[in-house]
A protein has these predicted regions:
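A well-structured
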Residues: 1-203
């Protein structure tokens, strides 16, 4: 008689799945499509209003701009997290793979529209920024965030190079990560006479 302790006992194949419904119900969710369209247009509107003007804003106006930037970033994070976790949960599904790739490309375009903001913020002189912070209680709320952004100030490249590096991310590092995932999916391992994927074998 075969028992659970027997080497011939069937391996458990049911792996746990993430419940991502707090983010979106599915890759075909209407809410997801609306949010992606919304953040796309919000980013374009943000760029149209503030690009090449960040250094001219007073403290309260800069705080309001940061709040709008933060809203875009949070929505991008929600969409990106859902896409990444959905893909990680089933890298073998070609439909999910295509969804993940398309979402990454669209979010990259949104990020490109927003890229100018942190770059221009870092161009503000230290004394000028200190004055803005002193005169605006609203801006003081974002002091830790501004400090963290400006840590990278000495290493900032020209706007053109920063934009180019950002645009190439989908075809660069991100593409290599996806290639690794797809390669791992294609691997099969013989475990007690059964052909298992790497995920099944590890669990």
């Amino acid at each position: 008689e075969m028992t659970d302790e027997s080497p011939d006992a069937p391996l458990p194949m049911e792996l746990p799945e993430w419940d991502l419904s707090d983010l979106y119900l599915s890759i075909d969710s209407e809410e997801l499509a609306r949010d992606l369209e919304r953040v796309t247009w919000d980013a374009k509107g943000f760029a149209a209003e503030f690009k090449e003007r960040v250094g001219d804003l007073d403290g309260d106006a800069l705080a309001a701009a940061i709040a709008r930037y933060e809203t875009c970033q949070e929505l991008m994070g929600r969409i990106g997290s859902f896409a990444s976790l959905t893909y990680a949960g089933n890298v073998e599904d070609p439909e999910i793979g295509a969804f993940f790739q398309d979402t990454q490309e669209q979010l990259n375009l949104v990020g490109t529209d927003l890229l100018f903001f942190s770059l221009e913020l870092n161009l503000i002189d230290e004394d000028a920024l200190a004055h803005l912070l002193e005169c605006s209680t609203a801006l003081q709320h974002y002091r830790p965030w501004i400090r963290d952004i400006r840590v990278f100030r000495p290493y900032q490249l020209s706007d053109e190079l920063e934009r180019l590096l950002h645009e190439k991310d989908v075809a660069g590092r991100t593409a290599w990560v996806r290639l690794f995932d797809q390669t791992m999916v294609g691997l099969r391992f013989d475990v007690e006479g059964r052909s298992l994927s790497s995920e099944e074998a590890l669990h």
